[in-house]
């Protein structure tokens, strides 16, 4: 009778503990990283790039997610619910925000909604109705993620190198910068002009190049390299001399003059691309040239902007110079 009374007294306590155990341990679950405009990070099982949400379990115990809700609407916390899957301690789980609504246990999980790249609140809610992790609305550029740093515990930050299904090991950025604004669109123009660059973000610096290279804050002094245009093709032929060229990043401080560069010496068109000792395709004189201007915005503690490239061709005949469409790759 004594043991029976103990069992009767203990059973409700044990039942109460186990009933609460999963919600308690679920507090270690976080939305660790998200991407709302995916064009090049990871693909789903259908070989397509989709938005994704990464969960991370920082606790000591596996958590069963059955009945947990994911939503982009604070008024509908269980917009999409998890099937009977568990997330082990220290593990990550990718849920695709693709609107494909897949909940097959053992397969990849897909929500029944997508996430706007301009920003939506994302919520993870446990079976007790408690929202245990919330990502605030944030405007994300393509292939930029937003996640916790330090991993799993810190505030949210921007990442230029996303880490789906892995820890956020590199320090994130507190701000993401908008691309620079050019005062003139690319194209053919009949006369030169002064190009102005601007940034919509305060306290920033604009870097640009005129040689087609990527703007780089570590190349403000320029980089010189050497190359050769001649190599022996036949016995007795000598190696050609070393030639030199350079590329450099500039800091924008004043309008950039854009003019017809056709009278300047040939550079790229004068570089050999074959093993011919005397290439027959070198131009006999200066050729028609365009202006390639590439720029980006930087700021301490902020994720640099995407590089913007513009091409300008100055000629009296304007766009009528060629009868065929012109495609510029830079």
Language-model regions: role of each:
Residues 2, 45-46, 200, 284:
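First exposed extracellular module after export/assembly in secreted or surface-exposed proteins
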Residues 3-4, 20, 30, 36, ...:
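Intrinsically disordered, low-complexity peptide-like regions
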Residues 30, 85-89, 95, 138-330:
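Short, compositionally stereotyped local motifs that mark structural "simplifiers"
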Residues 25-155:
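Activation on beta-sandwich/Ig-like modules and their edge loops
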Residues 16-25:
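C-terminal segment of classical bacterial N-terminal signal peptides
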Residues 1-11, 22:
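Bacterial N-terminal signal peptides that target proteins for export
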